[in-house]
Structures are given as structure tokens and as C-alpha cells.
A protein has these predicted regions:
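Bacterial N-terminal signal peptides that target proteins for export
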Residues: 2-13
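Substrate-binding surface in catalytic domains of secreted glycosidases
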Residues: 152-165, 173, 216-254, 279-282
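Active-site glycine- and acidic-residue-rich loops that bind
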Residues: 195-201, 241
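Short, functionally important secondary-structure microenvironments
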Residues: 205
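Active-site clefts of carbohydrate-active enzymes
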Residues: 228-229, 251-289
Length: 430
């Protein structure tokens, strides 16, 4: 009887041990070398910038992410303030401070559309003057974005006259005025505030009436308000996949875009962050917000978006890579990792659903970004046929809290990816 009881007791223990071994099995990587997607530089390192940002005080950190595009003046500031010649002076200085390569970051400039008060400089001739002012500073503007979040003019700003049709008329008028100054100018819009039903309706009606003249269709992504669970917040990154697909289809449909369906207009996300509530640090200046931002950026690049600008570069409430005091946030570390995702994207998958994976080939080097979304470490087999692992760095919430450098990982057949971490692995083609 005693032996029988011992055997019965041993079976659950043995099962637990076997389950533990199975759960601890390293994830394996599968790289598809037959498909390649060019990764636009103006997605990987794009940011919203405003003249209120003390760039000079944090230039070392901000240069470390190698900005590739700046959207100016960034957010609601463009709705509430005139765009004057004086605005372009600090912009030019900070553009020079943030230049890390042979060329400065590309520039997107928002024109003023919403008036809000008598005397506001939001007429077509004011947009033309802004173009002349930019030329006077020898600034090369890649895109003029006409206004900012016009879907909210009637909702948050109390002016019901701002329909999509009125915005389209304004877009045409400002565009025509700027083209007289700069015949090669390109134009972006409508920069709707989100992808809820109201904003999507606004964007769709804009496309129907202005699809023939918009050169970059833009919208903003803010899927949460910072109050969801961490798991729900991270999973909201799926909106990127959904929205890129549906807006590409919208533009290419003759029914939805009767005036411009043959143009294959590029896509742009000119503001994005996990939460839209600047006064609430949760899911903006924490690790979850950083992991979401990195994943959203990588997905935008891989899925064919041409321009993206994270909100924001610096010191905008809880938004920004560093705060007003110059203290780094997790998003700084995330974009330091992302800057290396250059060249051609290669599909990379694993058998661990907790891992987000991306790969980019540039010459003989393959860069892999691996995000562990789980709250515990997950093992990863580093083997990739035809490649040799030559380097690895990661960061966690603790890394940021202690303001440490990235954690250098030992090179081995298996790596433990820390909980809620973003790891960069570098391989060399054999």
C-alpha cells in the first residue's frame, strides 16, 4: 500500500517537472530570405518637434536616436498659433543640432487651418508666405501638411462649419497658393485625430473629394487613454495592421477615391503613441509605452507606410523621449534600438507568441529586434542558418530607472530574453 501511494504521489510531481521542461524550451527563429521589404528611413526615426523643446540641453540623447524626419510645429500648436518667419529660425538651429548623417532630417511643416480668433493667419496667402519663409531659411520641406486633426474642429473646438468638404476646399486653396511659391511642393492630409468611426468618416469623405491632389494620406494613432491593463494596451498595436490595410484599400478603390484611385498615394501616420493623454504618464513614459512604440514603428515600416512621426521627440507632458529635466524615458532606449532597423525587412517568426520579432538585412549584417511582452523571461534559440550571431544588447525597465547603458548579452546558442524587454541581436551572413 505504501509503495502504491508513493507511486501515485510521484506521478503529479513528474508531470509538473516535464511541464516545466516543456515550458522552458527555447523559442526557435524562422527567417524568410526570399522576401524583402525596403524600410523607409522616414518611418524608423520620425518625430513631432516643437520650438518649446529644449533640444540643446538633451542633444546627446536626442542625437542617439538619429532622427530622420521632423514634423513641425507638432500637434495642436499648429492649430492655435500662426506660422511666422520667426518660427523657422529655432527650427533651423535645432534641425542642425539633430543632424547625425550627411543630410538633415526630412521636414514636414503643418500649415495653420483652424482660425479660432480674429486675425488668425490661416488664409491661402498665409500658407504661401510660410513657404517663402521656409525658403528664406534654406529649409527643404518634404511635405506641407494642411492643418492638424480637422475632424476635431467641430467636436472639440465648437465650429460645426468644419465639415470634410470645407476642409477639402481649404486644402485645395492652400495647396494652390504654396505651389505658386514652390512648384515642386508635396502635400499631406487630413491628419485626422484617430481611427474611430467619426475620424474615419472624415478621412473617407476627404479622399472622395480630394483624392486627386493629396500626395500623402495621413492619420493619427492613439489607441488608448492609459487606463487599460498592460496586456490590453500592448495588444492594441494590432490597430496598425488594420488601419494600414483599410486605408490602402480606400485609396485604391475607384468607388471610394473616384478622383485619384490610379495614383497609388503613399500613406503616413503623423502622430502616434499608445495613449493620447499627455497628463497621464502611464503607458507613455513607462516600459509598456516604449515597447508599444517600437512595435508600432516596425510594423508601419514593414507594411509600406512612407512617413511616420512619433509623438513626441521631447518634453510634451508625459510624451517625449526625455523629460524637461533631461531624464531619459524608456522610449529613448526603444528608439536607440530601432535606429538600427535599416535596409530591407525580412519576415521573421518564432513559435513563442509572447515574442514580437523583426529583422532587417543591410549588406552582410542582419539586425533582429526581439520584444518579450511577457512578465517573465523567455528563452530564445539564437540559431539562424547561414548567419553567425556577433552581438546582442537589451534593456529593461530597471535599465532605464538606473539610467544605465544597454545590457550587453553573452553570445550563446540560447539567450534568456528578460521580462518586458527589447533586445537587438546582430548577425553576420556566412
Amino acid at each position: 500500500v505504501t509503495l502504491h501511494l508513493l507511486r501515485r504521489a510521484a506521478w503529479p510531481l513528474l508531470g509538473t517537472c516535464l511541464f516545466g521542461l516543456a515550458a522552458a524550451a527555447p523559442a526557435t527563429l524562422t527567417l524568410d530570405t526570399t522576401r524583402a521589404t525596403p524600410l523607409p528611413p522616414t518611418v524608423i526615426g520620425g518625430f513631432n518637434y516643437g520650438n518649446w523643446m529644449p533640444v540643446v540641453e538633451a542633444q546627446k540623447d536626442l542625437r542617439s536616436v538619429a532622427p530622420t524626419l521632423l514634423r513641425f510645429p507638432g500637434g495642436n500648436v499648429g492649430d492655435e498659433n500662426d506660422l511666422t518667419a520667426a518660427n523657422f529660425v529655432p527650427l533651423k538651429s535645432n534641425l542642425e543640432l539633430l543632424t547625425t548623417g550627411p543630410k538633415p532630417p526630412a521636414l514636414m511643416v503643418q500649415t495653420r487651418v483652424f482660425g479660432g480668433k480674429p486675425g488668425a493667419k490661416n488664409a491661402p496667402e498665409d500658407a504661401a508666405q510660410a513657404a517663402r519663409d521656409a525658403q528664406a531659411q534654406q529649409l527643404q520641406v518634404a511635405y506641407w501638411e494642411i492643418g492638424n486633426e480637422p475632424d476635431l474642429y467641430s467636436v472639440n473646438r465648437g465650429d460645426a462649419s468644419w465639415t470634410p468638404e470645407r476642409y477639402c476646399d481649404t486644402f485645395r486653396a492652400q495647396r494652390q497658393a504654396i505651389l505658386k511659391v514652390d512648384p515642386g511642393a508635396k502635400f499631406a492630409g487630413p491628419a485626422v485625430s484617430n481611427t474611430g468611426d467619426g475620424a474615419v468618416n472624415f478621412l473617407s469623405r476627404f479622399v472622395k473629394n480630394c483624392g486627386d491632389i493629396v500626395d500623402l494620406l495621413t492619420w493619427h494613432e492613439y489607441p488608448t487613454d492609459g487606463t487599460r491593463s498592460d496586456a490590453e494596451a500592448l495588444s492594441s498595436v494590432s490597430v496598425i495592421d488594420r488601419d494600414v490595410k483599410r486605408f490602402r484599400a480606400l485609396l485604391d478603390s475607384q468607388e471610394s477615391n473616384p478622383l485619384g484611385y490610379t495614383r497609388h498615394t503613399p500613406l503616413g501616420v503623423t502622430e502616434y503613441s499608445l495613449s493620447y493623454v499627455s497628463a497621464r504618464p502611464r503607458h507613455l513614459s513607462d516600459q509598456v509605452g516604449a515597447l508599444w512604440a517600437a512595435e508600432a514603428t516596425a510594423r508601419l515600416a514593414e507594411q509600406g507606410v512612407s512617413v511616420a512621426a512619433y509623438f513626441a521627440l521631447q518634453a510634451t507632458g508625459a510624451h517625449g523621449l526625455v523629460d524637461l529635466a533631461g531624464i531619459p524615458r524608456p522610449t529613448l532606449y526603444a528608439f536607440q534600438q530601432l535606429r538600427h532597423l535599416t535596409g530591407e525587412g525580412r519576415p521573421l517568426t518564432s513559435d513563442d507568441p509572447a515574442l514580437w520579432l523583426h529583422a532587417a538585412q543591410e549588406g552582410a549584417l542582419l539586425t533582429v529586434l526581439a520584444t518579450n511582452t511577457a512578465t517573465e523571461a523567455h528563452p530564445l534559440s539564437t540559431a539562424l542558418p547561414g548567419y553567425q550571431l556577433i552581438g546582442g544588447k537589451t534593456f529593461t525597465e530597471k535599465t532605464v530607472e538606473e539610467e544605465d547603458d544597454m545590457v550587453r548579452l553573452p553570445l550563446g546558442a540560447t539567450l534568456d530574453l528578460p521580462a518586458r524587454s527589447l533586445t537587438r541581436l546582430v548577425y553576420k551572413r556566412q
